[in-house]
Amino acid sequence: MDIKEAGPFPVKKEQFRMTVNGQAWEVAAVPTTHLSDLLRKEFQLTGTKVSCGIGRCGACSILIDGKLANACMTMAYQADGHSITTIEGLQKEELDMCQTAFLEEGGFQCGYCTPGMIIALKALFRETPQPSDKDIEEGLAGNLCRCTGYGGIMRSACRIRRELNGGRRESGF
């Protein structure tokens, strides 16, 4: 029995199974461990950032079964049996389309928000392959950029949309 001290009350660790970036994992954790902590500490996946810790900034954005989620608001027990994708799961041998767009369109400044922004756009474009400018703004509404680099972020999003649209020029950002 693996026990973790949580103040004066011992808390029992439990076994959880999940797929992270295509790899099956079994991990022992306290059920209320934040998924962001599990990803960063147990799996050494530090691309998932933690900033606000209350689900308002989007720095910890991940995909759970392809749906956008905040890792800082998701507990280990909620991830049990699910497929998790982090920013590290997008890159195999070459940069993903979203990552390339951010790189070539200047969609980052300090880079702290970039993983969350890219993950949020992956979720948006999966659900809405040709989003309007308003759809893009709404899709990124849960992600904050401390450097206010929104112009480059929107250019990156529009480039992705354009590439998915066969490269045709469009109005918008």
UniProtKB/Swiss-Prot annotation:
Chain sites annotated for binding [2Fe-2S] cluster 1: 52, 57, 60, 72
Pathway(s) served: Purine metabolism; hypoxanthine degradation; urate from hypoxanthine: step 1/2; Purine metabolism; hypoxanthine degradation; urate from hypoxanthine: step 2/2
Residues holding [2Fe-2S] cluster 2: 110, 113, 145, 147
Catalysed conversion reaction: xanthine + NAD(+) + H2O = urate + NADH + H(+); hypoxanthine + NAD(+) + H2O = xanthine + NADH + H(+)
Keyword Iron-sulfur recorded: yes
Source organism, top-level taxon: Bacteria
Inducing factors: Expression is very low in excess nitrogen (glutamate plus ammonia) and is induced during limiting-nitrogen conditions (glutamate). Expression decreases when allantoin is added during limiting-nitrogen conditions.
GO-annotated biological processes: hypoxanthine catabolic process
EC number: 1.17.1.4
Cofactor: [2Fe-2S] cluster
Name of a matching Pfam family: Fer2_2
TM ranges: none
Cofactor note: Binds 2 [2Fe-2S] clusters.
PANTHER family attached to this UniProt entry: OXIDOREDUCTASE WITH IRON-SULFUR SUBUNIT, XANTHINE DEHYDROGENASE SUBUNIT E-RELATED
Protein name (record): Probable xanthine dehydrogenase subunit E
Species this chain originates from: Bacillus subtilis (strain 168)
